[in-house]
Amino acid sequence: MDRRIFGLETEFGVTCAFEGQRKLSPDEVARYLFRKVVSWGRSSNVFLKNGARLYLDVGSHPEYATPECDDVRQLVVHDRAGERTLEGLLTDAERRLEEEGIAGEVFLFKNNTDSAGNSYGCHENYLVSRHGEFGKLSDVLIPFLVSRQLIVGAGKVVQTPRGAVYSLSQRADHIWEGVSSATTRSRPIINTRDEPHADAERYRRLHVIVGDSNMSETTTMLKLGATDLVLRMVEEGVVLREMTMENPIRAIREISHDMTGRKPVRLANGREASALEIQEEYLEKAKEFVESRGLQTPTIKRVLDLWERALRAVATQDFSLVDREVDWVIKKKLLDRYMAKHDLPLTSPRIARLDLAYHDIHRKRGLHYMLAERGMAERVCSDIEVFEALSVPPQTTRAKLRGDFVRAAQEKRRDFTVDWVHLKLNDQAQRTVLCKDPFKAVDDRVERLIDSM
């Protein structure tokens, strides 16, 4: 698929630090966060002017689903805009708490595990054609997804009975199946619940739930860009080596705990291969594919370059090659320096706090933002682009129709209902437009509906 629709859904961790007597549960904190949203949207599940969806997910986790994007870089911008949207809710919630005499700070974390061991996710969505074999797609994709934490993991200090270890991925220890239709109960690598949010005869939505939430823009770009290239190769029938794993769930945990990338993983055909070898195989094929198809866009060039350097960094253990571009490496460098400076072990509670602070989405507190400010974490997009994406939908996908409709209805104070495919005015006529084509950014029916307000 030359042009693909992408989207990211990110659940955020919520916590609160209170100074007074009154303590609030995460549920209560979440209600404070969403009070402003509920006051104008009459619900804690709303679509915004930029085409995105904002809602309160199970277990009081705020979730932001980006609008449909047809470009990896554009999606990185909209993913950042989601962080800014939630930062706005956070500031508003703190102000309300203060007005009510409750002293405390609200924290939102873009990570994947809380102190109680609960896991929440960052789900990637890729539109794929209905006509291919989904089984074949997942066969090729699973070894890639299991091993890609080597280059796109968010990193985490894990406390074990034998002491603390640094893992590549936050999510790896919480994945229980390869392919499944459930997302929470049995956390698979690929979720097969068939909800294309598009014409079901033409498309299906590949829902990848194995990935970490990334703070680094360059890591997000690599995660999406490399996965897109692997998908394109499968769609075009590129022959890839048989990499099916004997036990992908055991493999994902073993790989996460091995920073050398060299631990052998048993394959279904009896052979063994390391995460490094598996990733190198996909990278070589992707480079040949891009070369032969003439696909050298600036983003694809940047993705391939970072992919190659990240693997070289793991192979040589010289992480200075990517220590401003890959999340788990950026974070490890930060923790290592702090431990050396203060003579602390990895088990220190101060290190656990630092690990968490890396994922704080408040720009004045979050360590990733501070590093980016000092040039120690590279960017993909500018603050101006992110600011614009807060209120302007992507102009080349269905998100434009939805965003324009929401904006017009709010300005005209009209009652409306919106989801990924429907736009509805709740008037006597109950007029509804069904938008089944996610690639379509212009539609006369939507224009007429807006004009009729």
UniProtKB/Swiss-Prot annotation:
Binding site for Mg(2+): 9, 55, 63
UniProt lineage: Bacteria, Bacillati, Actinomycetota, Actinomycetes, Kineosporiales
GO molecular function: ATP binding; ligase activity, forming carbon-nitrogen bonds; magnesium ion binding; ubiquitin-like protein transferase activity
EC number(s) reported in the record: 6.3.1.19
Keyword presence, Lipoprotein: no
Root EC class: ligase
A single GO BP: proteasomal protein catabolic process
Catalytic activity line of the entry: ATP + [prokaryotic ubiquitin-like protein]-L-glutamate + [protein]-L-lysine = ADP + phosphate + N(6)-([prokaryotic ubiquitin-like protein]-gamma-L-glutamyl)-[protein]-L-lysine
Name this protein carries in UniProt: Pup--protein ligase
Keywords: ATP-binding, Ligase, Magnesium, Metal-binding, Nucleotide-binding, Ubl conjugation pathway
Manganese keyword on record: no
Function: Catalyzes the covalent attachment of the prokaryotic ubiquitin-like protein modifier Pup to the proteasomal substrate proteins, thereby targeting them for proteasomal degradation. This tagging system is termed pupylation. The ligation reaction involves the side-chain carboxylate of the C-terminal glutamate of Pup and the side-chain amino group of a substrate lysine.
Residues of the active site: 57
InterPro entries for this protein: Pup_ligase (IPR022279), Pup_ligase/deamidase (IPR004347)
The species this protein was found in: Kineococcus radiotolerans (strain ATCC BAA-149 / DSM 14245 / SRS30216)
Pathway(s) of this molecule: Protein degradation; proteasomal Pup-dependent pathway; Protein modification; protein pupylation
Anything else known: The reaction mechanism probably proceeds via the activation of Pup by phosphorylation of its C-terminal glutamate, which is then subject to nucleophilic attack by the substrate lysine, resulting in an isopeptide bond and the release of phosphate as a good leaving group.
Family the entry assigns: Belongs to the Pup ligase/Pup deamidase family. Pup-conjugating enzyme subfamily.
Binding site for ATP: 53, 66, 420
